């Protein structure tokens, strides 16, 4: 099985790009599964009573976040292993999480070694476009990312973090630009890099 980790700042369009990737892989008849790392963490955090919503996860104490990361990684690999050798697993997550205590690596050693991806993708877009997308998405609380300078800083930390994680497992790192108006281009680039 080939695993690709698709990272990006909130509002870059990961969920949209991955929905296009799902459609393309289905049309090609390729066995695949797309999972959201945050969903796995959220389900555990809700069960344990740590949070009431997804956006509260990044505000938890660092130790709680690490515990949730490890549990999620193990569960994801269990689920993706059902795809068999020819399957493609795409994981929607973040390379870094901006917390009150500083930047938390989204793919630290205890996570990346379990997931062992072929490629870590950095989905990026112009910070002004990301800010516009965030404003249009009223379903999420992202006030801690509501400035282009902060968005630029997070993008840079994500690049550093992705490369550091890739070194641990021999994965490649690929920047994919999500152009406004056509997420299928980014989706195709991700798929082609895993084939």
From Swiss-Prot:
InterPro entries according to UniProt: Adenylate_kinase_AdkA, P-loop_NTPase
Write out the GO cellular component annotations: cytoplasm
Q: Which Enzyme Commission number(s) are listed? A: 2.7.4.3
Could you list this entry's UniProt keywords, alphabetically sorted: ATP-binding, Cytoplasm, Kinase, Nucleotide-binding, Transferase
Residues that coordinate or bind ATP: 8-16
Subunit structure, per the record?
Answer: Homotrimer.
Protein known as: Adenylate kinase
> Which source organism does the UniProt entry give?
Saccharolobus solfataricus (strain ATCC 35092 / DSM 1617 / JCM 11322 / P2) (Sulfolobus solfataricus)
């Amino acid at each position: 099985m080939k695993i690709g980790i698709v990272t990006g700042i909130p509002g870059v369009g990961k969920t949209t790009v991955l929905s296009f990737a799902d459609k393309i892989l289905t049309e090609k008849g390729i066995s695949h599964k797309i999972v959201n790392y945050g969903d796995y963490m959220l389900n555990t955090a809700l069960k344990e009573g740590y949070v009431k919503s997804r956006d509260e996860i990044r505000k938890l104490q660092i130790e709680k976040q690490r515990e949730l990361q490890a549990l999620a990684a193990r569960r994801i690999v269990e689920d993706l292993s059902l795809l068999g050798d020819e399957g493609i697993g795409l994981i929607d997550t973040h390379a870094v999480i901006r917390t009150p205590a500083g930047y938390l690596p989204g793919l630290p050693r205890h996570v990346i070694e379990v997931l062992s991806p072929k490629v870590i993708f950095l989905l990026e877009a112009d910070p002004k476009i990301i800010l516009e997308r965030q404003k249009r998405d009223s379903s999420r609380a992202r006030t801690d990312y509501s400035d282009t300078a902060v968005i630029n800083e997070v993008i840079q930390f994500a690049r550093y973090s992705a490369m550091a994680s890739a070194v641990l497992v021999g994965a490649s790192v690929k920047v994919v630009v999500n152009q406004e108006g056509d997420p299928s281009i980014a989706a195709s680039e991700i798929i082609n890099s895993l084939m």
